[in-house]
Protein backbone atom coordinates (compact mmCIF):
# COMPACT_ATOMS: atom_id res chain seq x y z
CA UNK A 1 0.00 0.00 0.00
CA UNK A 2 2.83 2.39 0.86
CA UNK A 3 4.53 1.61 -2.46
CA UNK A 4 1.30 2.25 -4.38
CA UNK A 5 0.90 5.58 -2.58
CA UNK A 6 4.46 6.61 -3.54
CA UNK A 7 3.83 5.71 -7.20
CA UNK A 8 0.61 7.73 -7.32
CA UNK A 9 2.25 10.68 -5.56
CA UNK A 10 5.07 10.64 -8.11
CA UNK A 11 3.12 10.05 -11.35
CA UNK A 12 -0.44 11.04 -10.51
CA UNK A 13 -3.04 9.98 -13.10
CA UNK A 14 -0.25 8.58 -15.31
CA UNK A 15 0.71 5.98 -12.67
CA UNK A 16 -0.98 2.99 -14.37
CA UNK A 17 0.35 4.01 -17.78
CA UNK A 18 3.89 4.23 -16.38
CA UNK A 19 3.61 0.77 -14.78
CA UNK A 20 2.30 -0.79 -17.99
CA UNK A 21 4.40 0.96 -20.63
CA UNK A 22 7.47 2.51 -18.98
CA UNK A 23 7.95 0.78 -15.64
CA UNK A 24 11.67 1.54 -15.51
CA UNK A 25 10.63 5.09 -14.60
CA UNK A 26 9.68 3.68 -11.22
CA UNK A 27 13.40 3.65 -10.42
CA UNK A 28 12.96 7.40 -9.84
CA UNK A 29 11.12 6.52 -6.64
CA UNK A 30 13.46 6.16 -3.67
CA UNK A 31 13.54 2.67 -2.20
CA UNK A 32 12.27 0.80 -5.26
CA UNK A 33 14.72 -1.78 -6.58
CA UNK A 34 14.71 -3.31 -10.06
CA UNK A 35 13.46 -6.61 -8.68
CA UNK A 36 10.63 -4.91 -6.75
CA UNK A 37 9.64 -2.97 -9.88
CA UNK A 38 9.59 -6.23 -11.87
CA UNK A 39 7.27 -7.74 -9.24
CA UNK A 40 4.97 -4.72 -9.46
CA UNK A 41 4.89 -4.96 -13.26
CA UNK A 42 4.18 -8.72 -13.24
CA UNK A 43 1.36 -8.29 -10.72
CA UNK A 44 -0.11 -5.48 -12.84
CA UNK A 45 0.02 -7.57 -16.04
CA UNK A 46 -1.59 -10.49 -14.22
CA UNK A 47 -4.47 -8.35 -12.97
CA UNK A 48 -5.05 -6.92 -16.46
CA UNK A 49 -4.93 -10.44 -17.89
CA UNK A 50 -7.42 -11.79 -15.36
CA UNK A 51 -9.82 -8.92 -16.04
CA UNK A 52 -9.67 -9.50 -19.80
CA UNK A 53 -10.20 -13.24 -19.38
CA UNK A 54 -13.16 -12.77 -17.01
CA UNK A 55 -14.75 -10.41 -19.57
CA UNK A 56 -14.04 -12.84 -22.43
CA UNK A 57 -15.76 -15.72 -20.62
CA UNK A 58 -18.63 -13.58 -19.33
CA UNK A 59 -20.35 -13.69 -22.75
CA UNK A 60 -20.40 -17.49 -22.50
CA UNK A 61 -21.85 -17.46 -18.96
CA UNK A 62 -18.66 -18.89 -17.46
CA UNK A 63 -18.32 -17.73 -13.84
CA UNK A 64 -15.47 -15.40 -12.81
CA UNK A 65 -14.12 -18.10 -10.47
CA UNK A 66 -13.92 -20.59 -13.36
CA UNK A 67 -12.32 -17.92 -15.56
CA UNK A 68 -9.65 -17.31 -12.91
CA UNK A 69 -9.08 -21.08 -12.70
CA UNK A 70 -8.50 -21.12 -16.48
CA UNK A 71 -6.06 -18.21 -16.15
CA UNK A 72 -4.08 -20.05 -13.47
CA UNK A 73 -3.63 -23.02 -15.83
CA UNK A 74 -2.97 -21.22 -19.12
CA UNK A 75 -1.73 -17.75 -18.07
CA UNK A 76 -1.80 -14.59 -20.15
CA UNK A 77 -2.10 -16.54 -23.42
CA UNK A 78 -5.49 -17.96 -22.40
CA UNK A 79 -7.71 -16.12 -24.88
CA UNK A 80 -5.85 -17.01 -28.11
CA UNK A 81 -5.36 -20.55 -26.79
CA UNK A 82 -9.10 -20.97 -26.19
CA UNK A 83 -9.97 -19.36 -29.51
CA UNK A 84 -7.66 -21.85 -31.23
CA UNK A 85 -9.14 -24.85 -29.39
CA UNK A 86 -11.99 -24.27 -26.88
CA UNK A 87 -12.10 -27.98 -26.08
CA UNK A 88 -8.96 -27.72 -23.96
CA UNK A 89 -11.31 -26.24 -21.36
CA UNK A 90 -13.27 -29.49 -21.06
CA UNK A 91 -10.10 -31.57 -21.29
CA UNK A 92 -8.07 -29.72 -18.64
CA UNK A 93 -10.31 -27.59 -16.39
CA UNK A 94 -12.39 -29.16 -13.61
CA UNK A 95 -15.85 -27.62 -13.61
CA UNK A 96 -16.04 -26.76 -17.32
CA UNK A 97 -18.08 -29.38 -19.15
CA UNK A 98 -17.79 -30.59 -22.71
CA UNK A 99 -21.17 -28.97 -23.43
CA UNK A 100 -19.86 -25.57 -22.33
CA UNK A 101 -16.66 -25.94 -24.36
CA UNK A 102 -18.79 -27.06 -27.32
CA UNK A 103 -21.03 -24.00 -26.97
CA UNK A 104 -17.97 -21.72 -27.06
CA UNK A 105 -16.53 -23.63 -30.04
CA UNK A 106 -19.76 -23.41 -32.04
CA UNK A 107 -19.96 -19.65 -31.43
CA UNK A 108 -16.38 -19.38 -32.73
CA UNK A 109 -17.29 -21.23 -35.92
CA UNK A 110 -15.87 -24.70 -35.28
CA UNK A 111 -17.25 -27.56 -37.40
CA UNK A 112 -19.32 -30.25 -35.67
CA UNK A 113 -17.16 -32.90 -37.36
CA UNK A 114 -13.80 -31.30 -36.44
CA UNK A 115 -11.23 -33.66 -34.94
CA UNK A 116 -10.73 -31.56 -31.78
CA UNK A 117 -14.48 -31.70 -31.07
CA UNK A 118 -14.81 -35.44 -31.61
CA UNK A 119 -11.63 -36.20 -29.63
CA UNK A 120 -12.74 -34.08 -26.68
CA UNK A 121 -16.22 -35.62 -26.82
CA UNK A 122 -14.73 -39.12 -26.67
CA UNK A 123 -12.60 -38.21 -23.65
CA UNK A 124 -15.56 -36.64 -21.86
CA UNK A 125 -17.68 -39.76 -22.51
CA UNK A 126 -15.00 -42.02 -21.01
CA UNK A 127 -14.66 -39.73 -17.96
CA UNK A 128 -18.41 -39.39 -17.39
CA UNK A 129 -19.53 -42.98 -17.89
CA UNK A 130 -16.48 -44.50 -16.19
CA UNK A 131 -17.17 -42.30 -13.16
CA UNK A 132 -20.86 -43.29 -13.07
CA UNK A 133 -20.13 -47.01 -13.47
CA UNK A 134 -17.10 -47.13 -11.21
CA UNK A 135 -14.80 -48.40 -13.97
CA UNK A 136 -11.61 -46.89 -15.38
CA UNK A 137 -12.34 -47.91 -18.97
CA UNK A 138 -15.13 -48.32 -21.51
CA UNK A 139 -15.53 -50.94 -24.24
CA UNK A 140 -14.64 -49.47 -27.63
CA UNK A 141 -18.11 -50.23 -29.12
CA UNK A 142 -19.76 -48.36 -26.23
CA UNK A 143 -17.59 -45.29 -26.82
CA UNK A 144 -18.37 -45.32 -30.54
CA UNK A 145 -22.13 -45.63 -29.98
CA UNK A 146 -22.18 -42.92 -27.30
CA UNK A 147 -20.04 -40.53 -29.38
CA UNK A 148 -22.14 -40.97 -32.54
CA UNK A 149 -25.26 -40.19 -30.50
CA UNK A 150 -23.91 -37.31 -28.41
CA UNK A 151 -21.90 -35.56 -31.12
CA UNK A 152 -24.35 -36.30 -33.96
CA UNK A 153 -21.58 -37.41 -36.31
CA UNK A 154 -20.95 -40.50 -38.44
CA UNK A 155 -19.19 -43.56 -37.03
CA UNK A 156 -16.15 -43.22 -39.33
CA UNK A 157 -14.81 -39.93 -37.88
CA UNK A 158 -15.31 -41.30 -34.34
CA UNK A 159 -13.28 -44.42 -35.13
CA UNK A 160 -10.61 -42.25 -36.78
CA UNK A 161 -10.44 -40.02 -33.69
CA UNK A 162 -10.08 -43.01 -31.35
CA UNK A 163 -7.24 -44.34 -33.52
CA UNK A 164 -5.52 -40.95 -33.45
CA UNK A 165 -5.91 -40.64 -29.67
CA UNK A 166 -4.41 -44.11 -29.26
CA UNK A 167 -1.49 -43.16 -31.49
CA UNK A 168 -0.86 -39.97 -29.51
CA UNK A 169 -0.96 -41.89 -26.22
CA UNK A 170 -3.94 -39.97 -24.81
CA UNK A 171 -5.93 -43.22 -24.81
CA UNK A 172 -4.77 -46.74 -24.00
CA UNK A 173 -6.33 -49.93 -25.42
CA UNK A 174 -6.31 -53.37 -23.80
CA UNK A 175 -7.88 -56.46 -25.36
CA UNK A 176 -10.45 -58.06 -23.06
CA UNK A 177 -11.30 -60.99 -25.32
CA UNK A 178 -14.70 -59.96 -26.63
CA UNK A 179 -13.81 -56.28 -26.94
CA UNK A 180 -11.06 -53.68 -26.57
CA UNK A 181 -11.13 -51.75 -23.28
CA UNK A 182 -10.29 -48.08 -23.84
CA UNK A 183 -8.77 -46.07 -20.98
CA UNK A 184 -7.84 -42.45 -20.60
CA UNK A 185 -4.06 -42.49 -20.06
CA UNK A 186 -4.55 -40.83 -16.66
CA UNK A 187 -7.00 -43.53 -15.51
CA UNK A 188 -4.83 -46.32 -16.90
CA UNK A 189 -1.72 -45.09 -15.11
CA UNK A 190 -3.66 -44.66 -11.85
CA UNK A 191 -5.05 -48.19 -12.04
CA UNK A 192 -1.61 -49.69 -12.71
CA UNK A 193 -0.12 -47.74 -9.82
CA UNK A 194 -2.78 -49.07 -7.43
CA UNK A 195 -2.28 -52.64 -8.72
CA UNK A 196 1.50 -52.41 -8.32
CA UNK A 197 1.14 -51.11 -4.75
CA UNK A 198 -1.19 -53.99 -3.86
CA UNK A 199 1.26 -56.51 -5.32
CA UNK A 200 4.16 -54.96 -3.37
CA UNK A 201 2.11 -55.09 -0.17
CA UNK A 202 1.26 -58.77 -0.74
CA UNK A 203 4.88 -59.69 -1.42
CA UNK A 204 4.09 -61.27 -4.80
CA UNK A 205 6.92 -60.90 -7.32
CA UNK A 206 5.40 -61.20 -10.82
CA UNK A 207 5.17 -58.48 -13.47
CA UNK A 208 1.99 -56.71 -14.51
CA UNK A 209 1.33 -56.97 -18.23
Where do the language-model regions lie?
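Accessory alpha-helical DNA-binding modules that contact the DNA backbone or grooves
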Residues: 1-180, 197-201
